[in-house]
Amino acid sequence: MTEQAPLSFTPAVGDTPLTAKQRRLLTLAHELGRDKFAGRAALWDREGSFPFANYDDLREAGLLRLCVPEADGGLGADYATYMFVAAELGRFCGTTALTYNMHICSTMWTGVLADGIPMSDQERSEHLRRRQIHFERVVKDGAVYAQPFSEGSAAAAGRAPFGTTARKVEGGWRINGRKIFASLAGAANYYGVLCTEDKGDDKRDARDTLYMAVPADA
């Protein structure tokens, strides 16, 4: 077995065994943070502004598609690899790493995490069809996804139905509700709203939870 050359830096996660893919992505994140993010970090903190320039760099480097499966044009990173990359970005710009987490999680919910959820063949086929729509937006358009889940209740933990509802209407869905917080607000291209399907019977059930990717210009 060929011994891998040591990294030229000590990663944020410390001395831990890494695969060749993890080493490559960690190096990419380190160089991006060192050369681009570090010099801008104080500006975002001082102004309380969004790091749009950093997202342009993430997009150009292909890191917005980090956890999109390779079969769908992404880099196919698993959860551990994402953690390593996020930690490395965070050592140079906390603002970017925090908001980046929200975008990446949107691709993981429908990607590697959903792959571990039992589904019937029909459900799996429909899930794969739908998630490809979102993955194409990230891969081809460099789209950024936000996650407005929070409502100040137990809904986000799965212990209650979401107060935000979605009702099927002619031409699509009508979403009605209020979210109290969303990282990437004002910067995302799509907002992944978790809501409860309104079936017209006034009976809300957590099992009727829907994920609605609402365009920013809707």
Provide a role label for each language-model segment.
Residues T2-K21:
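Intrinsic disorder at enzyme termini
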Residues G14-D15, R40-A41, V68:
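Glycine- and acidic
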Residues L25-L32, S49-R65:
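N-terminal glycine-rich anion-binding loops that anchor highly charged ligand groups
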Residues L32-A42:
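N-terminal capping segment at the start of a domain
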Residues L43-D45, L75:
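A generic secondary-structure micro-motif detector
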Residues F52, R59, L66-N176:
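Glycine-rich flavin
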Residues R178-A218:
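A short core secondary-structure module
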